[in-house]
Amino acid sequence: MGSESSLVHVFLVSFPGQGHVNPLLRLGKRLASKGLLVTFTTPESIGKQMRKASNISDQPAPVGDGFIRFEFFEDGWDEDEPRRQDLDQYLPQLEKVGKVLIPQMIQKNAEQGRPVSCLINNPFIPWVSDVAETLGLPSAMLWVQSCACFLAYYHYYHGLVPFPSENAMEIDVQLPSMPLLKHDEVPSFLYPTTPYPFLRRAILGQYKNLEKPFCILMDTFQELEHEIIEYTSKICPIKTVGPLFKNPKAPNTTVKGDFMKADDCIGWLDSKPASSVVYVSFGSVVYLKQDQWDEIAYGLLNSGVNFLWVMKPPHKDSGYTVLTLPEGFLEKAGDRGKVVQWSPQEQVLAHPATACFVTHCGWNSSMEALTSGMPVVAFPQWGDQVTDAKYLVDEFKVGVRMCRGEAEDKLITRDVVEQCLREATQGPKAAEMKKNALKWKAAAEASFVEGGSSDRNLQAFVDEVKRRSIEITASKPAVKAAPNGVVAAAESVVETKANGKVELAA
C-alpha cells in the first residue's frame, strides 16, 4: 500500500439520500481496494448522521491497497430546514452551493498534496460533471438502478418509443433487448399521472449531461442483464461493476454509509432454525398507509412464520405519520417475531435462518437479495421498484408478486399476504425460487472475484483514471484553480461564518 499522498485521487460527490449514498460509498471502497485514494463528500446534514450511525472519522481509512476519507460541505440551509424534503427546492440549492464549494474543496486538496484526478457523482446531481469540466478534470457517473431502467429512461428522454401518456394511459412499452413492459411495469415516475413529477425531473436531469462523463458505472453485472447491457453499451460508455456491496479485497471493512444505527437482531436470528424467518423491509423511503400496515401485520401472524420486520420511522419533515402495530400484535407474535427500526440488511440476507425477503424491490435491495441467494416477495410501490419487481418475478424467477405498485391503488389483504408468504417458504415453487436465487448468487460471485466480468471492468476503469491522471500531471503542475468567475460566484452565493457554517449571502 502506498502512502496516501502518492495515490491517484478520485473525488466522489453523492446526492444526500440513503439509496444514493450506500452504492456510491460501496464504489468508493472498491476503488480504494484497487489502490486509489478516495474522498467521499455529501452535505454535512447527512455527514452528521453518518458519523453517528456508521464507523467513519476524519482520518483516512485503509481499504485494501488504498484509502477512503470523508469531507462534508454545508448546503447553505439550517440543520432543521424542512425544504430539504422538497426536491424542486433542494436540488437547485444544492447545485448553487455545490458548484461553488466543490471546486474550493478540490483546490484545497491540491494545495495539501492530494490533487484530484477524477470526479464521480450519482443521479440527481449531474452538475458535478460541469464542475469537473470547468476544472479540466475527467468525470464519471454511478447509475444506482438497473441497466433496464437506465435504458427505459434513455428512450423516454429521447422520445424513441411510445410511453403511457394522457391520451394512452395503458399502453405497453416495447424497448430494445427487453421483455414487453405492461404500463404498470414501466418506471412509474414516467407515468403522466405520477404524484412525483419532481423525481422524474431529477432523474432525467442526468440525461442532459450524459455526454460529459467518460464512463457510466452501473451497480449490476454482465450475467444478470446480458442482452440489455450489450445493447446499452453501443449507445453509452457503460461499465458494469456490481454487485458493489461485495468487496473481496476488503471483506471486513467497517466503513458504512447508514444514516441510522442498525438494531441488534443477529443474535435473535441465531436462535432460529435454518430457512425459517421471513425478513420484511421496505427500504429507507417507502412508507405505507396504516391500513396496509395492519394487513401485513395480520398476514404475518396468520401465516405462522417467524419474521423480522423493519419499521423505519419517517423523517420528521416528511409529512408521514408514525405507523403503529395492531393492539396486542407483539404479544401474539411472541418469540417468533422481532420488530426493529433498522437492520444490518447484508448480514440478515446472508444468515442461514432467513428464508425469504418481503421487499419494496429497490435496486440496492434487489441486488443484495440476488447476490445473497435470497428469494423475494415483491411489494413494489413506485419508481424503478415496479420494473425491478417485473424482473425479479418474471425474468430472474426468484420471487412471488404480492402487488403491482402504488398505481394499482389497492389494499393488499391479510389473506393475500399470508398466501404469498406460504408460497415463498413452502412447497415446490419455494424450492424452485431458491434454486434460481442460488444460481444468481453464484453468477454474482463469479462476476466480482478477481478476473470476473465486474472486476475486469472496475480494473479497466481504475487503469483509465490513472492514465488520465498522468496526462493531467503532464499538462499542468497542479489541478487548475477555480476560475475567477467561480470564485466571484462564491463570494456572492455563500458566506463562511466564524463557526465554519456556510450560508447564502444576503
Swiss-Prot record:
Organism annotation: Punica granatum
UniProt enzyme class: transferase
One of the GO BP terms on file: ferulate metabolic process
Compartments it resides in: Cytoplasm
Residues the entry annotates as binding an anthocyanidin: H20, G383
Catalytic activity reported: 3,4,5-trihydroxybenzoate + UDP-alpha-D-glucose = 1-O-galloyl-beta-D-glucose + UDP; 3,4-dihydroxybenzoate + UDP-alpha-D-glucose = 1-O-(3,4-dihydroxy-benzoyl)-beta-D-glucose + UDP; 4-hydroxybenzoate + UDP-alpha-D-glucose = 4-(beta-D-glucosyloxy)benzoate + UDP + H(+); (E)-cinnamate + UDP-alpha-D-glucose = 1-O-(trans-cinnamoyl)-beta-D-glucose + UDP
Temperature characteristics of this protein: Activity remains fairly constant between 20-55 degrees Celsius. Active even at 0 degrees Celsius.
Keywords on record: Cytoplasm, Glycosyltransferase, Transferase
Protein name: Gallate 1-beta-glucosyltransferase 84A23
Observed effect of gene inactivation: No difference in the levels of punicalagin in pomegranate hairy roots in a single RNAi knockdown of this gene. However, double RNAi knockdown of this gene together with UGT84A24 leads to significantly reduced levels of punicalagin and bis-hexahydroxydipheynyl glucose isomers, and to increased levels of galloyl glucosides (ether-linked gallic acid and glucose).
Transmembrane segments: none
Classification via InterPro entries: UDP_glucos_trans, UDP_glycos_trans_CS
Expressing tissues: Expressed in roots of the seedlings.
Stated pH dependence: Optimum pH is 5.
Catalytic machinery residues: H20 (proton acceptor)
Family to which the UniProt record says this protein belongs: Belongs to the UDP-glycosyltransferase family.
CC annotations in GO: cytoplasm
Entry keyword annotation includes Cytoplasm: yes
Molecular functions per Gene Ontology: 4-hydroxybenzoate 4-O-beta-D-glucosyltransferase activity; cinnamate beta-D-glucosyltransferase activity; flavone 7-O-beta-glucosyltransferase activity; gallate 1-beta-glucosyltransferase activity; isoflavone 7-O-glucosyltransferase activity; quercetin 3-O-glucosyltransferase activity; quercetin 7-O-glucosyltransferase activity; sinapate 1-glucosyltransferase activity
Main function: Glucosyltransferase that catalyzes the formation of 1-O-beta-D-glucose esters with hydroxybenzoic acids and cinnamic acid including its derivatives as preferred glucosyl acceptors. Has significant activity with gallic acid (3,4,5-trihydroxybenzoic acid), 3,4-dihydroxybenzoic acid, 4-hydroxybenzoic acid, cinnamic acid, sinapic acid, coumaric acid, caffeic acid and ferulic acid in vitro.
